[in-house]
């Protein structure tokens, strides 16, 4: 109806921050389906969470959680259909920092985790982007090389997810 609704808590993870968050949420909507992703460090544990809504954001399902020692966040989301989406995030391992992605569904399941590409973990690398176009899933991010930065892109077949 063109009017703002009252804010809704997606998940009460009780994360308290004392400053400006760099790691904001992402949302994608198609019809009444919403997919939201966010970083949290509640109770000192860094993780990213994703949640679906099938009623235009009135309610949300239980979060799908990605945990690990090196979760940085900088989440991104895309919908494949009303029940499935793609979740992306940054994660640091012993081998470096990577843009990761996986298929998720509204039933709480996560598919294979894909290592999309190496990234710089600093703020200069910005926030990765994700788009589903036709039968391809495109990813883009800033590659930081000293004083020179460039945008990197890669795509995977939608069927891979």
Language-model features, listed with the residues they occupy:
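Extracellular, repeat-based ectodomains that mediate carbohydrate processing or recognition
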Residues: 1-161
């Amino acid at each position: 109806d063109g009017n703002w609704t009252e804010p809704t808590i997606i998940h009460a993870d009780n994360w308290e921050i004392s400053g400006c968050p760099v790691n904001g949420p992402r949302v994608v909507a198609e019809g009444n389906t919403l997919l939201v992703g966010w970083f949290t460090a509640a109770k000192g544990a860094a993780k990213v969470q994703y949640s679906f809504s099938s009623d235009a954001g009135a309610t949300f399902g239980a979060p799908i959680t990605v945990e690990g020692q090196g979760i940085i966040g900088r989440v991104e989301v895309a919908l494949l259909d009303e029940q499935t989406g793609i979740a992306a995030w940054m994660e640091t391992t012993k081998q470096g920092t990577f843009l990761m992605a996986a298929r998720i569904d509204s039933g709480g399941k996560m598919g294979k985790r894909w290592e999309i590409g190496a990234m710089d973990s600093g703020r200069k690398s910005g926030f990765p982007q994700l788009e589903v176009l036709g039968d391809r899933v495109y990813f883009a991010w800033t590659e930081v090389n000293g004083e020179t930065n460039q945008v990197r892109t890669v795509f995977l077949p939608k069927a891979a997810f």
